Structure formats: structure tokens, C-alpha cells
UniProtKB/Swiss-Prot annotation:
The gene coding this protein: pacc1
Bias (Acidic residues): 15-38
Biological process, per Gene Ontology: chloride transport
Cell membrane found in the keyword field: yes
Single GO MF annotation: pH-gated chloride channel activity
Gene source species: Xenopus tropicalis
Record protein name field: Proton-activated chloride channel
Length: 352
């Protein structure tokens, strides 16, 4: 009897151990439940098997797999487009850095800084220099004879910066300032007994007459001006009207360069003198500001690094999301495939 009791207690203990719960993965438990449901539906009466026949279930599985593959291909296409956008964005940014856009603006002024007018008369002699306003020049009283000189002028001599041998003599005249009142400077020169076939006087313009006066080395200042600015000419026997405009250009290193642009009009001088000498030439020139606007030019880099960073972040986010979705889709397809194989094996076992 005691042996029978020990054997019964041992059997009850084994049954209790088998009845204890085992830790199961939630996904595996869910798969097992689905498999059990599918198995139950497989061994159900013929009515249920008729309603959900194997060809219908197989077509549904194929359709799901087809759409999964299609979604993966779509997201791979989106990933390719995103990679192309990243490449194109970086390329455009580098191209904009190399090729800045020119920006032009206009600054309105009431008074200009008096420009410097450097004239190289040669053998010609200055007869008169006057300031007038409102584009009005009074009639000439006695052309060819010395007249009034109300301009601020200064003579200077320096060595030609190009030849380093020729001595050049320049007459520096303070230019007009009041653009609102249309201030102008009218100069008259006289040249007698010229042996040249053509006669003309050279001149150049620089931005500030005051800067010339304050310069410690005026000779070096004029040599630099002649090296930096272009020179022009006006001919004898005509009145040359020069209308100036100022252009300031900001360089890449932050420095600023100044350039004069001019429009000229030439009017023939009617010589009414009774006995003009042969070879006698009169030169007339007028300097005036064209308008009260200074043109400012600078290069602007249109590439915005913050917009590029934002675009790259959004593209990378799309890439990560697409990769995550593709990963989940592949996992789901593998799970469906395994479930289908298990179900098929169970059906074969059941049939056998």
C-alpha cells in the first residue's frame, strides 16, 4: 500500500509540473493562436471548408505578397529620388558658392564729394574756369582771351607710371558738388601755333579732390590714379559736355573700388573772331553730374546653408522612414511565408 501511495504522489507531482505556465513570446503566442484557429477551421465540417477553400486562401496570400513587394519597390524608388535630391542640392549649393549673383542698388544723394579733374593741357593755356548752375552757361564775351578763374586748382608734376621716364604736368581742378542745383564747371583752353595734325587735351577723373589735398604724397596719389582710372580726351574747336556718374563696387575681400562713367556730347564752336591766327585752337569742356544716384554693385551669394540643411534633414528622415517600412514589410513577408509553410505541413499531416 505504501508503495502504491508513493507512486500516486509522484504522478500527481509530475502532472502539477506539467501544468505550470511557461513564458511564451507574445508574437509567438499570437502566431500559435492564429495557427490553432486555422487548424480548427481546417478540421471543421465540410460547410466551413466549402466557404474558405484552399484556392481562395492561396489567392489572398499571393495578393498580399504582391502588394508588399509593390510597396517595397515604391519605397525603393522614393529612396532613389531622395538620394538624387541630396546630390542635386549639394551640387547646386557648391555652384552658387562659386558663382555669386551681382546685386545692383542705387543710393540717392543731395551733394557729391567734389571729384578731382586731372587735365593734361600740354602746351595749351587755361583761359578761364567758372562754376555755373542749372545747366546755364552765359554767352562768351571775348573767346580766346583770359577770363575769370573761380575754380580751385593746383598744378602738379610727376613721372609717368608706365614709362618711368616722361615727366607729366597736370592741372588738378575741383569738380562740381551740388547735383540738385545742377552745378557745372566750365573750362576754356587756348593752344597757339600747334604743329600737330590733330589737337586734343587728355583728362581723367578721380573720386575725391579732398583726398588728393590730404594725401601726404600727392605725386604717388596721382600715379596710382593714372594706373587705376581710364583717361579721356576732348578736341579743339568744340564744346565737350561731360555728364558724370559714379559707380561703387564692393569686392570679395571687403574693399571698395570707385569708377566713373560718363556721357559726352560735342557741339561745334562757331568762331566769330575777326582775325584768328592760323593753327590757333580753342578748347571748351563742361563737367556736370548726370543724376543724384550712386550705383552700388556687390556680389551676393544666394546659397542659403540653413535651407540646404533643412532639406537634407527632411530627405534623410524620408530615407530612414522608407528603410524602416521596407524592413517591417520584409519581416511581415517572412512571417507570412513561415505561417503558410507550417499550415501546409499541418494539412499534409492531417491528410496522411
Amino acid at each position: 500500500m505504501e508503495a502504491i501511495r508513493k507512486e500516486l504522489s509522484r504522478s500527481y507531482q509530475e502532472l502539477n509540473e506539467e501544468a505550470e505556465p511557461v513564458a511564451i513570446d507574445p508574437e509567438e503566442a499570437e502566431d500559435e493562436e492564429k495557427e490553432q484557429e486555422e487548424a480548427a477551421s481546417a478540421v471543421a465540417p465540410d460547410r466551413d471548408s466549402d466557404r474558405s477553400s484552399p484556392p481562395v486562401r492561396f489567392s489572398r496570400t499571393c495578393l498580399k505578397n504582391f502588394f508588399s513587394v509593390l510597396l517595397i519597390l515604391v519605397y525603393l524608388l522614393l529612396m532613389g529620388v531622395a538620394v538624387f535630391l541630396v546630390y542635386q542640392t549639394i551640387t547646386d549649393f557648391r555652384d552658387k558658392l562659386k558663382h555669386p549673383v551681382m546685386s545692383v542698388s542705387y543710393k540717392e544723394v543731395n551733394m557729391y564729394d567734389a571729384p578731382g579733374i586731372a587735365l593734361y593741357p600740354g602746351k595749351a593755356r587755361l583761359l578761364s574756369c567758372e562754376h555755373h548752375w542749372y545747366d546755364h552757361i552765359p554767352p562768351l564775351k571775348d573767346p580766346g582771351q583770359p577770363g575769370e578763374n573761380t575754380c580751385v586748382t593746383q598744378d602738379i608734376s610727376y613721372i609717368d607710371p608706365y614709362t618711368n621716364k616722361t615727366m607729366k604736368h597736370a592741372l588738378i581742378v575741383q569738380g562740381p558738388r551740388d547735383v540738385r542745383r545742377r552745378e557745372l564747371v566750365f573750362l576754356q583752353f587756348h593752344l597757339n601755333e600747334t604743329k600737330q595734325d590733330f589737337s586734343a587735351i587728355d583728362y581723367l577723373l578721380f573720386s575725391s579732390y579732398e583726398a588728393f589735398l590730404k594725401s601726404h604724397d600727392q605725386v604717388k596719389f596721382m600715379q596710382d590714379c593714372e594706373s587705376s582710372f581710364s583717361s579721356w580726351k576732348f578736341s579743339g574747336g568744340f564744346r565737350t559736355w561731360v555728364k558724370m556718374s559714379l559707380v561703387k563696387t564692393k569686392e570679395e575681400d571687403g574693399s571698395q573700388s570707385v569708377e566713373f562713367r560718363q556721357e559726352t556730347s560735342v557741339v561745334n564752336f562757331i568762331d566769330r573772331r575777326e582775325t584768328p591766327d592760323k593753327g590757333d585752337q580753342l578748347f571748351f569742356v563742361v563737367f556736370e553730374w548726370k543724376d543724384p544716384y550712386i550705383q552700388e554693385i556687390q556680389d551676393i551669394i544666394t546659397a542659403n546653408p540653413w535651407s540646404m540643411i533643412a532639406l537634407l534633414c527632411s530627405v534623410f528622415l524620408v530615407l530612414f522612414k522608407a528603410a524602416d517600412f521596407a524592413k517591417l514589410s520584409v519581416k511581415w513577408m517572412i512571417k507570412v511565408r513561415r505561417r503558410h509553410l507550417k499550415k501546409r505541413a499541418r494539412e499534409l499531416n492531417h491528410i496522411s
